[in-house]
Amino acid sequence: MGILSSLLLLKRNQKPKMLKDIPYFFNGPAPYIFAHRGGMSVRPEQTQLAFDNAVDYGLDGFETDVRLTKDEELIVFHDATVDRTTNGSGKVCDYTLKELKKLDAGFHFTDINGRHIYRGHQQAKILTFDELLEMYPSKYINVDLKDTPSSYEGAIAPKKMYDIIKHHHAEKRVLVTSFHKKQNERFRAISNGEIATGASQHEVTEGVIKFILGLGYHYHPQADTFQMPIKFKGIPLSSTHFIQWLNLLNIVPGYYGINSVDLMYDLYQKGVHTIVTDRPDLGKQFKSLLKQHLSLIHI
């Protein structure tokens, strides 16, 4: 894209007159580095083993997911079934919490040498969302409501989520999102702006299309942040101009699947606020590099 066309695109996507306020969740020093499912490349995902490891590396928080059990408990879990990550089989919603707690969430995890080093580990257990907030009171939590809106679990999960967050007085350190637009709408209606929310895939797609067409000034999102991959179906989503446009709208830009220190630094320089990685060790390397860079600037 040439300089003239870039300037014209930004002009056409100019800042609207009325903007949403940026929630307190994003008030900390940027960038935030979050461990994806606790850092799933190096520890069994969504377990205390993973979250403790991310804390040890000094990351700011976690990106995680929740699903509802048979007895209506919110657990920290990604898949609709337990097969991929545990020694169990079947749907999460067909298990009670007590039954899920008996499963080995480190059963299928392998290290770089192909060894199952965390099978049977006491800290390789499924956690509830309540336990996660209790165990890590100083960490930011970016949580994705996974149950589909049309299911019974999906219908009641947003209210369950809200009640747990309120119980822990965690309104300022939790970001709630979902790939499903309906779930985001439900949670926003319940929380009434108290808690930061992310964009659904539909909301992100709408924003990207309007930006590309130069109709960005017609975009009035409810979401506080976009969380995206670097590209989607061949369409790049991390251009400097797109990130600038998001910041102009007070939509906090965030990217996931970032497992390169160089890419983390590139995104930071473009104005990205939140970076989600599978590798907490790389997150720590980046934070150290950034600290050195900033100290040199201020000499």
Would you name each region that the model predicts?
Residues 297-299:
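Conserved small/polar residues in nucleotide/adenosyl-binding loops
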Residues 53-67:
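Catalytic domains of carbohydrate-active enzymes, especially glycoside hydrolases
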Residues 2-17, 78-190, 194, 221-249:
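Metal-dependent phosphodiesterase/phospholipase catalytic core, i.e.
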Residues 185-187, 261-272:
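Catalytic cores of alpha/beta
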Residues 273-286:
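Glycine-rich phosphate-binding active-site loops on the catalytic face of alpha/beta enzymes
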